From Swiss-Prot:
Official protein name in the record: 4-hydroxy-tetrahydrodipicolinate synthase
Example of a GO biological process term: lysine biosynthetic process via diaminopimelate
Predominant localisation class: cytoplasm
Pfam families from the UniProt entry: DHDPS
Catalytic site: 133 (proton donor/acceptor), 161 (schiff-base intermediate with substrate)
Site (Part of a proton relay during catalysis): 44, 107
Organism of derivation: Aliivibrio fischeri (strain ATCC 700601 / ES114)
Entry keyword annotation includes Signal: no
The family this protein is said to belong to: Belongs to the DapA family.
Organism lineage string: Bacteria, Pseudomonadati, Pseudomonadota, Gammaproteobacteria, Vibrionales
Function: Catalyzes the condensation of (S)-aspartate-beta-semialdehyde [(S)-ASA] and pyruvate to 4-hydroxy-tetrahydrodipicolinate (HTPA).
Coiled coil start-end: none
Signal sequence range: none
UniProt cross-references to InterPro entries, sorted A to Z: Aldolase_TIM, DapA, DapA-like, Schiff_base-form_aldolases_AS, Schiff_base-form_aldolases_CS
Amino acid sequence: MFSGSIVALVTPLDTDGEVDYNSLKSLVDYHIKAGTNGIVAVGTTGESATLSVEEHVKLVMKTLEFADGRIPVIAGTGANATHEAVTFSKLFHDSGVAGCLSVTPYYNKPTQEGLFQHYKAISEATDIPQILYNVPGRTAVDLLPETVARLAELDNIVALKDATGDLDRVAITRELCGENFIQLSGDDATALDFVKLGGHGVISVTSNIAAKDMATMFALAAQGKFEEAEIINQRLMPLHNDLFVEANPIPVKWAAHRLGMITHSDIRLPLTELSLSAQPTVEQALKSAGLLK
């Protein structure tokens, strides 16, 4: 259902801070041409935290429109209030989204039982396939493998995006949830190793600007050609790392603009554009990856 290289798509903005739908269409077409296996619209990289509900819904629907059935679209639907996460998921009922990506509730630090009840409520409210999203570095809460296993028993909770960077969890989660439960890395730098250990793919920041390389790398991995995949991975490693020299998605939006993929690198406050001191680092990473001369 979900595998390979799935992009956590940036949300292009104009200089007035409004969504640039022309650039969005270009990005969708770019990923289809490059062989990307799926698009996450309005996740963390898509600046979900600073979009209004109306913008959020329109962005997902426009992404679906531009995709036109040519690539699966996953809607970001996470919130730190359960009723809001439920509402977001229900808004996309019959929309054509392939699934919903729902981050753990952030800031309010629920217990494991609270996390279970949160996702259970979402599961009961919709039949859209749900992807759990664990990123404790941003949310201050860790969805433990034992809780994932409880949730995996619910019919439409089908996958986990694991952005912990803890590769030991791949085998633990596989043992607890079974091999059919989909595990997706949320950490580009360790994603290939994640797949070597039994994961199914990645939801990627790097893929925003190196989509063909990422798609090829994970296609090779799926064929067991890990040595060939590792050659690509090592070339992209500076990008995997330096796209986080400042908070995501600041560097990747700057890089996408530098490559002419989006019209502007604007980002909504409280995030600010990539600092002058960090720009040479990202520029060099683009050159190391072969994306700039």
